[in-house]
Amino acid sequence: MSLFKKDISKKELEKAFNEIQMNLENNYIDLAIKAYKDADLMLNNYHKESKIDEKTYTKFKARLDIFAKRMEGYSHRLNVKY
């Protein structure tokens, strides 16, 4: 695995996390939920395919958990967990 590919993966993850942050700040509930799910899927795929190392995975997973905590109860429906 080249260092260049890992940098690209990190940049793509940063972009996905920035999208979540932007949607949360603008109170776009549906878009924030979709961006969260997409980022979670991307993070897990990159980890499974060894495109990111364990340290990077742990760092991004912690950030994703913070977003999950902030998004508790985000829905147009009641009592929905993500």
Predicted regions and their residues:
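N-terminal acidic leader/helix
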Residues: 2-33, 76
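Alpha-helical linker/edge segments of TPR/alpha-solenoid repeat scaffolds
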Residues: 60-82
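Generic structural concept
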Residues: 10, 14-17, 33-40, 61-64, ...
